[in-house]
Every structure is written in structure tokens, then in C-alpha cells.
């Protein structure tokens, strides 16, 4: 398994890990042949492929790689091609908009995107359905609830502090931490409670700072654009990370203006993220055309980008950060004004 570095990525990896281990045990196959490692981005890179192929070669094993909550994008094509060139079987389980070239390199692909482009059906949920078909008794419905809450899915119900705990642990883990490490931690109630408490404290502190560094722009009578400087409250050594911090900003303003269509744009030196609430989506706002236009107009400035209709991100070249931010703000205002 190769899984993304947040709760949805971890839970989707855990679903496949647990089911594959249970299957191996039943078939009297070596369970230690099932393992997994975190990927600290949405891109499966050539370096990731090299590490996986070498790891399998050194163990004298044929390799199959299951990638969860990442890898179905154009930026991952080189890494996926490296896997295929080595004779590796490739499966991707994801809920992000897929790239045709990436899919062409997969032996199997499981996604919710054709019937849900909002991303509400998380990778954790899709992986759960795959896990049930591998070994039904090992699939864990509780992990699905964690992933739905963490990704702010409209399918989420209930309150699961474990979701915050896994997001916190993933943020501070080593870049390629093993899936076994998470498998142990999700059974450690004390560890999860501690991580949850630390996550909440970090979020409270970050929101307090960001409220002082966010501006609001009225668009028409029913829409607001919130622009927040995420660098004021986030860093590699603090929690929450930028995406989670922007969620806090979005939630805060949605609570203040419950009848408004609200889009939040959070930026730092090298990235910009978008969040849109249900009213904005219902009015027709979609982040993907905004990002597609940026890629077309400023290809030299955009390193990578994509996401869902209501939550997306672009990585930018630092020297072009300001110009990308200004253009994105214009595109969002234009999109909201049309609705």
C-alpha cells in the first residue's frame, strides 16, 4: 500500500492492509508480504516507484502496489509508468478527479468520482468497499466514519475524535512511515486521546490568529470570498497544516453567515487552497475550472494542482506566488458573480 498523509489516506490504507493480511492468513500465505508506506503528497513520484521496486527486489518478491487517496493525477504519471516498466501490478483507490493517462497505467482502479465529483464518497469509503470484497470480516466501518468526518464529507454523521487524532499523527509522522505504525496506534486509546487534545489546542490557536489575517469580499448579494494568509498560523512544526487551517476559516465564516455562498482562498508562499460551502456548490461553483484556467494561463507558475469541486489546491513556484494569487482571486470572483 501507498497511502496519503491524512486521516482519509491512512484509513483507506488501513482498510486494504487489514483485508489483505486477513486474506493471506486464510490462504496460509506470508502475512509479512503485505505492507505499506505513507506518501507525503498527492503525487506518486518516480522516487516512490524506485523505492517500492527496490524493496520488492531486495525481498525477492513480485510487486503489486495499491495506491490510496492519491496517484490518479497527471503529476503521478511518471511514477506510475516506472512501476509498469518494472512489471509491477498497479491499483489505485481514490475519489479525486482522475487523469486518463494515469488510469491507462492501472491494472485496476476503484473510484467514486463518476457519480460524485464532490469527493463526499471518500477514499476511505471506497477502500472499505474494496476491502469487503477481499475479506469481508476485516473491513472496518468505523474507519470509514473517521475518513468521512476528516474530509468534511456530506455523508458524515456523528462525532469521531479519532479523525482529528489521525490527522494530527499523520501531520507529524515521518514522510514514509509504515502502515504497521498506524495499525498499532488506532488500537491505542490513550494515544488517540492525547493526539485529539493536541489537535484541538492547535486548531483553537490557529483560528484565533487567522481571524486577524483574513479579509472578506462581498460578491453580489449572496456570496462572500474569504482570503486568508495561512503562513501567519501554520508551519511544518505546528498543527494544523494549511489545508486543515483553511477548513477552520471556512467553518468560522459559514457559521457567521449561514445563508451566504462562501468560498475561502487560503495562501502561503508556495501553495493556494480553495474551500466552497454547500450553498456555493448548489449555485454552481466548482473549483476545478478555476484551477484548469490557472494551469492554462500560467503553466510556468503552477507546479501541480487539482482536487474536488469544493476543495482544491495548487502548488506554485514561489517567485510567481503573488501573481497566481491575484489571478485566482479574480477567477473565483468571476465564477461567483455568474451564479
Segments the model singles out, each with a brief description of its role:
Residues 5-11, 22-91, 97-103:
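N-terminal small/polar loop signature for handling phosphorylated ligands or for N-terminal nucleophile
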Residues 13-17, 50, 124-132, 243-250, ...:
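Predominant activation on well-ordered alpha-helical scaffold segments within soluble catalytic domains
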Residues 229-339:
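Glycine-rich, acidic loop segments that terminate in or are immediately followed by a histidine
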Residues 15-19, 81-85, 245-250, 279-281:
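Short, solvent-exposed amphipathic alpha-helical segments in soluble enzyme
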Residues 66, 89-93, 108-110, 263-265:
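Hydrophobic/aromatic beta-strand patches that form the interior of the parallel beta-sheet core
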Residues 1, 5-6, 102-241, 249-257, ...:
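A structured phosphate/pyrophosphate-recognition subdomain
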Residues 91-92, 96-109, 290-299:
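Flexible glycine/proline-rich, aromatic-decorated loop/lid segments
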Amino acid at each position: 500500500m501507498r497511502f496519503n498523509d491524512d486521516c482519509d489516506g491512512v484509513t483507506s490504507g488501513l482498510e486494504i492492509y487489514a483485508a489483505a493480511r486477513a486474506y493471506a492468513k486464510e490462504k496460509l500465505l506470508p502475512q509479512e508480504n503485505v505492507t505499506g508506506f505513507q506518501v507525503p503528497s498527492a503525487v506518486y513520484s518516480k522516487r516512490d516507484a524506485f523505492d517500492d521496486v527496490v524493496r520488492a527486489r531486495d525481498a525477492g518478491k513480485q510487486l503489486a502496489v495499491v495506491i490510496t487517496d492519491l496517484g490518479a493525477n497527471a503529476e503521478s504519471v511518471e511514477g506510475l509508468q516506472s512501476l509498469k516498466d518494472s512489471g509491477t501490478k498497479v491499483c489505485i483507490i481514490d475519489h479525486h478527479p482522475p487523469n486518463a493517462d494515469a488510469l491507462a497505467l492501472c491494472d485496476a482502479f476503484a473510484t467514486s468520482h463518476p457519480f460524485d465529483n464532490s469527493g463526499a464518497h471518500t477514499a476511505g469509503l471506497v477502500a472499505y468497499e474494496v476491502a469487503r470484497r477481499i475479506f469481508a470480516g476485516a473491513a472496518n466501518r468505523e474507519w470509514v466514519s473517521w475518513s468521512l468526518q476528516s474530509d468534511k464529507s456530506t455523508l458524515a454523521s456523528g462525532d469521531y475524535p479519532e479523525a482529528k487524532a489521525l490527522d494530527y499523527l499523520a501531520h507529524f509522522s515521518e514522510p514514509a512511515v509504515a502502515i504497521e505504525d498506524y495499525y498499532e496506534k488506532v488500537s491505542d486509546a490513550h494515544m488517540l486521546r492525547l493526539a485529539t487534545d493536541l489537535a484541538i489546542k492547535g486548531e483553537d490557536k490557529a483560528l484565533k490568529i487567522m481571524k486577524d489575517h483574513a479579509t472578506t469580499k462581498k460578491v453580489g448579494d449572496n456570496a462572500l470570498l474569504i482570503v486568508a494568509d495561512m503562513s501567519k498560523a501554520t508551519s511544518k512544526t505546528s498543527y494544523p497544516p494549511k489545508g486543515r487551517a483553511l477548513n477552520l476559516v471556512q467553518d468560522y465564516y459559514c457559521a457567521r453567515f449561514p445563508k451566504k455562498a462562501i468560498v475561502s482562498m487560503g495562501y502561503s508562499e508556495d501553495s493556494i487552497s480553495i474551500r466552497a460551502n454547500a450553498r456555493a456548490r448548489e449555485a454552481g461553483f466548482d473549483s476545478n475550472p478555476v484551477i484548469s484556467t490557472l494551469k492554462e494561463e500560467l503553466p510556468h507558475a503552477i507546479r501541480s494542482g487539482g482536487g474536488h469541486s469544493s476543495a482544491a489546491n495548487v502548488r506554485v513556484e514561489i517567485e510567481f506566488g503573488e501573481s497566481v494569487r491575484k489571478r485566482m482571486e479574480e477567477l473565483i470572483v468571476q465564477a461567483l458573480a455568474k451564479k
